[in-house]
C-alpha cells in the first residue's frame, strides 16, 4: 500500500502492531485520531494528526476525527506528573465546538465521544464496559504505572477506559 510507504518515509508511521493487517485494511474500516478539547483551538501539535488524516483520506481510507467531549471533562493523565485541572463542562463544550468547526473546515468527518456516554448511567457503564476491562493490563500501562507512585485519582484512571471504549 503506497500510503504506508509514504507515511513511513515521512517519519509519521513508526510502529505498527500488525503491519500485514494494516496493509490489507478493509475498505469499510476507519482510521481515527483523537483531539482533546482542553484548549480553545487546535494547535501546532495537532498539525501532524490533521495532515495524516488528510493523507489517509486522499489514499481512499475512511478517516475520522474524534473530539473528546467526554474525555475532555476528565483530562488525560498521560505525560503528567500531577492531575490536570478540570475544566468546567461549559469550557469543554466551548472548546469542543471550536475544534469541531476547525476540523470540519479541513473536510474531516468529526465525531464527539460524548455521544457514547451522554445517556449512560454509572451502573450501565460498569455492566457494559467495566466487565470487559482487565485492571492488571491497565496497571501495566506506562501512563498509569508512572502516576501510581505519586497518586492517581480514579477519574484519571478511568480516562483510559472512557477513551478506549
Task: List where the protein language model places each region.
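NTP-dependent nucleotidyl-transfer catalytic core
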Residues: 1-165
Amino acid at each position: 500500500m503506497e500510503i504506508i510507504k509514504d507515511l513511513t518515509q515521512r517519519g509519521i508511521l513508526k510502529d505498527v502492531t500488525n503491519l500485514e493487517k494494516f496493509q490489507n485494511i478493509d475498505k469499510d474500516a476507519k482510521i481515527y485520531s483523537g483531539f482533546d478539547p482542553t484548549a480553545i483551538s487546535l494547535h501546532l501539535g495537532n498539525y501532524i494528526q490533521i495532515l495524516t488524516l488528510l493523507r489517509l483520506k486522499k489514499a481512499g481510507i475512511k478517516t475520522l476525527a474524534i473530539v473528546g467531549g467526554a474525555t475532555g471533562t476528565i483530562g488525560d493523565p498521560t505525560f503528567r506528573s500531577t492531575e490536570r485541572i478540570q475544566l468546567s463542562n461549559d469550557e469543554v463544550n466551548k472548546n469542543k465546538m471550536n475544534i469541531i468547526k476547525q476540523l470540519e473546515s479541513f473536510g474531516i468527518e468529526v465525531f464527539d465521544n460524548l455521544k457514547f456516554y451522554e445517556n449512560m448511567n454509572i451502573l450501565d457503564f460498569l455492566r457494559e464496559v467495566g466487565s470487559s476491562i482487565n485492571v492488571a493490563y491497565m496497571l501495566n500501562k506506562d501512563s498509569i504505572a508512572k502516576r501510581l507512585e505519586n497518586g492517581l485519582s480514579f477519574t484519571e484512571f478511568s480516562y483510559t477506559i472512557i477513551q478506549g471504549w
